[in-house]
A protein has these predicted regions:
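Short, C-terminally biased terminal segments at protein or domain edges
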Residues: 1-54, 58-117
Length: 117
């Protein structure tokens, strides 16, 4: 079990904090009856951290890279849903989520790249 607020593993910390923000944001969407997008965003946005966490117990280096690649894919999917929210009228502001996600996606990309060496 991991301490998600520890600075020992920055990607776990950032993705856990991001998941909490996604929960809060999707609750706002649901309160505005924007259920379909809320569910899509909730699933992909929280999956980034879940996959990064699962990678910590990978059976091999290849398994670790594979799980981190899934986290990267979920990051890209989340970026898509947030971009839709940003461009759609009457949706709550999500710029802060996009900014945090860009950082997370870059870190995951660097982790994957450095793990391949």
């Amino acid at each position: 079990m991991h301490d998600y607020y520890s600075d020992d593993n920055i990607i776990l910390k950032l993705t856990f904090e991001f998941s909490l923000l996604i929960i809060e944001y999707t609750e706002k969407l649901e309160s505005q009856t924007k259920y379909i997008l809320a569910r899509q965003l909730f699933g992909s946005g929280t999956s980034i951290g879940a996959n990064a966490n699962e990678a910590q117990n990978a059976e091999s280096k290849a398994d670790f890279i594979h799980k981190m690649k899934i986290a990267a894919k979920k990051g890209e999917e989340t970026f898509y849903w947030l971009s839709l929210c940003k461009q759609s009228p009457n949706y709550p502001d999500c710029d802060f989520l996009i900014e945090k996600l860009i950082i997370i996606n870059r870190i995951i990309g660097k982790i994957i790249f450095s793990s391949k060496k």
